[in-house]
Amino acid sequence: MSLTGYFAAPLCSIFLFILAHADAGQQEDSLYMWIDAHQARVLIGFEEDILIVAEGKMAPFTHDFRKAQQRMPAIPVNIHAMNFTWQATGQAEYFYEFLSLRSLDKGIMADPTVNMPLLGTVPHKATVIQVGFPCLGNQDGVAAFEVNVIVMNSEGNVILQTPQNAIFFKTCQQAKCTGGCRNGGFCNDRHVCECPDGFYGPHCEKALCMPRCMNGGLCVTPGLCICPPGYYGINCDKVNCTTHCLNGGTCFYPGKCICPSGYEGEQCETSKCQQPCRNGGKCSGKNKCKCSKGYQGDLCSKPVCEPSCGAHGTCIEPNKCQCKEGWNGRYCNKKYGSNLMNALRPTGSRNRQHTPSPKRTEDRQALPESNYIW
């Protein structure tokens, strides 16, 4: 027998006791559990199926658990998990529940693990159950642990269960990971660093930031980015410009501005219009102005009057006309004095021909000449 087989052979006795009789009179005949030949080779050095439960009954073995437990060795360092195979044949339904998977020495080994739900139905297809013994690798030592599981039939009767107060043992040793484990990671017994949440890498040296660090930022701890010069923000997504962007420009890179239409230059300080836009207008393209309300023209130099001042006036400000001589009104559409003469003329003579006297003509010509602005 190999050296591994010499130390591993008694291990079968440990797991032959994981399930013991709960009801000696039970005659269920379609539940099976065994250790397959491949796993047996690892344990005892030769390939042979090891039957644990057959036809709902335990394989012939001692039932004096206390005496047997005294002879149980600790699981060796080189065995990290054990595989069992089970199957429910026929039409019968069986249910299982892991009541406890607990390490009693958590500084040496974490809680045992299984590769299946803790509560479920025994499958009708041969299925492997793997029980793992996760040594932490922090120190040399032997960890005590318990595995408590029951199997019930469809009527809810417990037919198999772990003996009460069953304690098992696993030998662990301090692991060595070349380069060490950082950021709270620990070296397991497979000499691999196991990293805490938020870190990854062979030595747990890399932090995980979500969202990721942008613009060359470095994630130094979960959720914290160190930003390169010129950037800031939770994930370095914001730009810190040393120079201010003018005329509505936007900084997108340290010292670089995205200029709005009509401006150029490092700080968007230069207008693309050769002559500046007037009256509040903005340069919107090469030599093209976008005028503010009330103005028009290439340079926004022409005021707008609505409606227009007509043929007898000039628009000098938005909606403000300057009338020619002899014209008045807001839009210069009224001739000066016409309303006054009609008002003074007698009613009966408005339709008669009338020749003004020389004196009235002189008085009329004596009216002051003025350029009205309305």
UniProtKB/Swiss-Prot annotation:
GO terms for molecular function: signaling receptor binding. During somatogenesis, expressed predominantly in unsegmented paraxial presomitic mesoderm and, to a much lesser extent, in newly segmented somites. PROSITE patterns: EGF_1, EGF_2, EGF_3, WIF. GO terms for biological process: Wnt signaling pathway. Keywords: Developmental protein, Disulfide bond, EGF-like domain, Glycoprotein, Repeat, Secreted, Signal, Wnt signaling pathway. Residues 33-172 form the WIF domain. It holds the Pfam family JAG1-like_EGF2. Residues 343-374 are annotated as: Disordered. Residues 1-28 form the signal peptide. It is found in: Secreted. Disulfide bonds join C135-C172, C177-C187, C181-C193, C195-C204, C209-C219, C213-C225, C227-C236, C241-C251, C245-C257, C259-C268, C273-C283, C277-C289, C291-C300, C305-C315, C309-C321, C323-C332. Glycans are attached at N83, N240. It comes from the Eukaryota. Residues 173-205, 208-237, 237-269, 270-301, 302-333 form the EGF-like domain. Transmembrane segments: none annotated. Residues 348-358 have a biased composition (Polar residues). Binds to WNT proteins and inhibits their activities. May be involved in mesoderm segmentation. PANTHER family: EGF-LIKE-DOMAIN, MULTIPLE 7, 8, WNT INHIBITORY FACTOR 1. This is Wnt inhibitory factor 1. It comes from Xenopus laevis (African clawed frog).
